[in-house]
């Protein structure tokens, strides 16, 4: 069944015996939160975010894959769920499933933190330096809100990001580069594979001896 939430097309399919929803979300933390609230209300229990991010660690290059271990909130949505929390974390179990699936699919990746902002044109040198010191390697506009909503609603969430540009003295955009588009598709296929394999493994473990 194909339908829409907040003007975003939603595809539902069965993967590994489970119903899976895929939605192409709009840009930004508030949009991500609205999408998640709807999906969770419809019964979603595990969220995998596949996104694109700018690299602030210039050792990363367009097309590189980063599995998030945390996200610093510099946006206005997550504070409506948890006041005073600076860094949000993904759920451990789906993050492990995600990393295992990427390895099985031969997709090289690293782990790192994201800096999530509402103001991409205010990514100043001072802010970039601050978040680099804090441990962030990429910047995006959604991940901290994704983790915040998931934690508040008691569902699991993990995130994998593809580097789409490099934020430095000389901005290096590569949003529509072949390597970025190809890697996004590869990663999405790996996520779907992981959801199928991970759920099958959970069912095997749940069976009585």
Predicted segment positions?
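Flexible, glycine/charged-enriched surface loops at secondary-structure junctions
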Residues: 1-4, 106-113, 198-209
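Short acidic/polar active-site loop segments enriched in Thr and Asp
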Residues: 45-46, 137, 156
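His/Asp/Glu-rich mid-to-C-terminal helical/loop segments that flank catalytic regions of hydrolases
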Residues: 167-209
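Active-site rim beta-loop-alpha module in soluble metabolic enzymes
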Residues: 85-134
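Zn-dependent metallopeptidase/amidohydrolase metal-coordination segment
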Residues: 144-179
């Amino acid at each position: 069944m194909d339908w829409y939430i907040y003007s975003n097309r939603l595809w539902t399919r069965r993967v590994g015996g489970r119903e899976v929803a895929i939605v192409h979300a709009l840009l930004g933390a508030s949009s991500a939160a609205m999408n998640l609230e709807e999906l969770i209300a419809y019964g979603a229990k595990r969220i995998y975010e596949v996104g694109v991010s700018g690299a602030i660690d210039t050792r990363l290059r367009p097309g590189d894959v980063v599995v998030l271990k945390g996200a610093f909130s510099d946006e206005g949505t997550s504070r409506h769920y948890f006041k005073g929390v600076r860094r949000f974390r993904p759920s451990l179990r789906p993050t492990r499933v995600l990393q295992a699936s990427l390895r099985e699919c031969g997709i090289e990746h690293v782990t790192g933190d994201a800096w999530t902002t509402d103001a991409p044109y205010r990514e100043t040198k001072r802010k970039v330096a601050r978040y680099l010191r804090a441990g962030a390697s990429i910047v995006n506009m959604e991940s901290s809100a994704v983790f915040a909503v998931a934690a508040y609603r008691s569902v699991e969430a993990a995130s994998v990001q593809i580097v789409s540009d490099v934020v430095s003295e000389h901005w290096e955009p590569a949003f529509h580069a072949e390597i970025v588009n190809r890697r996004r598709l590869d990663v999405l296929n790996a996520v779907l594979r992981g959801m199928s394999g991970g759920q099958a493994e959970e069912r095997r473990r749940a069976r009585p001896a």
